[in-house]
Regions:
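Charged, low-complexity intrinsically disordered segments
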Residues: 7-158
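Short, Lys/Arg-enriched N-terminal segments with co-localized hydrophobic residues
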Residues: 1-7
């Protein structure tokens, strides 16, 4: 019976939704220390310590090296993949003086204005975005992957 529940918990049909990471129990466990770090930024003294030396402050947390590097790069898509909760990751943006709208835009490869206009117009089209493998704009191959991704992209020829 316990094994049956374990197997059911591994069956995640929602993993086929492109551009979406569901913050479930597995993600929560994976990102526990990352999310605790984010919560610490709710205190002014901790924000100041983080801004004074980000790496030193991050090293006080039992986060994985990959999580720390994602925070340092402000690669929020990677932070989410590593268990970060978007509502807690917003504390990093607030510490940087960014609005949630600016953060969300950066995660989609849009400017703040483009993101705002898309949301006002009703969000992304479901066409091409219903399941992984289609060719819509929410598909993983069309998403920015942070500064490391941008740096690895070939430069357009003149």
């Amino acid at each position: 019976f316990v094994l049956g529940r374990l197997i059911m918990s591994l069956d995640k049909p929602y993993l086929d939704v492109p551009g979406t990471t569901i913050f479930d129990a597995e993600q929560s466990r994976k990102g526990y220390h990352l999310n605790q770090f984010c919560m610490s930024l709710m205190t002014a003294a901790n924000r100041e310590r983080f801004k004074a030396d980000e790496r030193v402050y991050l090293d006080e947390w039992a986060m994985t090296e990959e999580q720390k590097l994602a925070v340092l790069a402000r690669d929020l898509n990677r932070c989410i993949a590593l268990g970060g909760n978007i509502y807690l990751l917003a504390k990093i943006g607030a510490t940087d003086g960014k609005s949630f709208q600016q953060m969300a835009g950066s995660m989609t490869g849009m400017t703040e204005e483009e993101y705002r206009n898309m949301m006002i117009a009703g969000g992304r089209s479901v066409e091409g975005n219903r399941v992984v493998g289609e060719d819509g704009d929410a598909q993983a191959h069309r998403q920015p992957q942070g500064s490391a991704h941008a740096a690895s992209q070939p430069k357009a020829s003149a």
